[in-house]
Every structure is written in C-alpha cells, then in structure tokens.
Amino acid sequence: MRSGGWVLILAAAVTLVGTVWNLAPLFDPNRVRPRGDGREARSYDFDLTTTLVPKEKIVSCGMVADALPPLDDPKVITLAELSGLETVGRGKYLVPKDKVIGVVINGVSRAYPLRVLVWHEVVNDTVSGVPIVVTYNPLSEGIAVFDRRVAGQALTFGVSGLLYQSNLLMYDHAGSHAAESLWSQLQARAIAGPAASEARTLDVVPFALARWEDWQAAWPETTILGPVNGDGTKYGQDVYGTYFNSDDLRFPVDPLPPAGSLGRKTRVFVSGTPGAWTVTPLGVQNDESRFEVVGPSGTTPVPGFYAFWFAWYATHADDPGTTETTESR
C-alpha cells in the first residue's frame, strides 16, 4: 500500500474512534478549528523561525494536532477494578501477553498498556507527586518517559501532528501559539519555539517494557492506566500490523542506517548520555517468540529509550555514540 493510502486509513480509524467517544462533536459551533491541514508543517501555527533540526525535515503526519488526543490526569484503576471491568465488559481490557510500559516512583508502580497509548501517544500523569509524561510513537516504535518539570514549571504536552525523522514531536501547552514549543521524543529536547531558544531538555524517567502478566507478578500493588470510557474494548483495533511487518517507511527519514548495519526496524534499547550511548538490539521485528523486555527481568525500570533502529539512527546521526552497538540479546 502506498504511503498516502496508509495515512488515510489511519486517519479514518482515528476519526471513527473519536466520533464514537464523542471527543469532539462535529456540529458544535463552539468547537475550536482543528490545528493544521494534514499537509504543510507551517499550517500548524508553531513557531518554526528558529529550529534545532533542519526545518525541511519537520513534516505533517497527515492528521491535525491532537487528532490522537493526549490524556491529561487520566483515570487510573486498581487490579480489583480491572477484574470488575473485565467481568462486565464485552472483552478483556488487558490480557497476559499485552505489552505495558511500567514505571515505579517512590515505591508507587503504574502500568500503561501499549494498546491504549497507540491511540493517544502522550499521557500527562502524576505518580507519587511526580509529574511525568509517558510517550509512545508507533511509527518509530519510540517509547520514553519524562519528568514534566522544566525550569521549575510542570508542563503538559500534546500531539503536534508533526514528525521529525518519522518520530513524534510533542508540543507544550503554554497558553498561546507564540509561547509553545515543539519537543522531540527521541532527542528529549525542544527543537523549535521559545524552549528551543533556551536549550531546554527533558529528564528521562526509568521505565520497563514488559508483558502485563510479568509486570503484575512483580508489582502486585500496581495501578493501571484505565480506559477513557466504557470497558476499553475500543482499544482492540490494530492499524500498524502491516507496517510493523515490513521495512517500508511511511514518512521521510534521512539519513538511513548504512548497509551492513542493523535492520531498519530492529528494536533497540538505548541508554547512556549524548556521545556515550549504548545501543542494544532487542531481536527480530514483530517476532513475539523473541519479544525482549526492557529492564532487568523486564520488571525493574531503567532510564533510556526504546525505538526502531532507523529512528534512533536518524535522530542521532551526528552523535558518535549512535554507532556503538552491542550484540543482540
């Protein structure tokens, strides 16, 4: 399928889910005009006067800003509530093999199912008094968790509708378009707007990527990101399966990893600091029998990033540490 068709299918799916959930009633005269036209980056009204990445490489994902609605102060449920939810629902909200992003802050554990994040990408949450943002970008398979506190202020983030190297660009809700900045998920920094001019960065929060059954066993007191409404079965749709099973890319990426490097969509975990990254391949794409967890035994959070190799390479091509890889586990 050509790129345009894939984008239209994803956009249609998002629109359908949004309609069902009544997130933005179509005929509400007070509804704010959607931000962006789904084609030109400049139509999204972000300040691109000065950018820390090549401006021409910032592109639209084909949808308006926040078409994938971020979750702010989301509903959180306990294991007991999860059991009740599954009893009354038409299906299970979580099954043992589902992948979750797990965090533990001051002894408080929480799980964020990927099947939920695929429809939101950004979750602004607070765990044990610490404001965090949990991010997942399926196009790059990018996963990162950050402390939302920047320069003494707890920011909230949205989904800009723009990409850099086929990776999520978030934006902060700063009150006005002129005050907002774009933030790169895999670079953990502002790349456009006032925060970029001030060289603002995000602090990484340790996370684990694990199967739900393993996370629950390790953290029996864990809470879980709950469904937006109802029983959560709307999250069962999968629009990325074909994409995950091929080497095709849907948006511009330059540079690509050199020949003889890891496969484009080899999943990697990256730890360290700029100039001294450790890049660990995690196995064959979409091969559930070789699913690798992040963190010791998959249940102890560690600081770092998870992504497809092509996305990490492209967003860190100028960093000498990018080429240092270890053997696949």
Language-model features: locations:
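Mid-to-C-terminal functional-domain signal that highlights helix-capping/loop sites
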Residues: 2-329
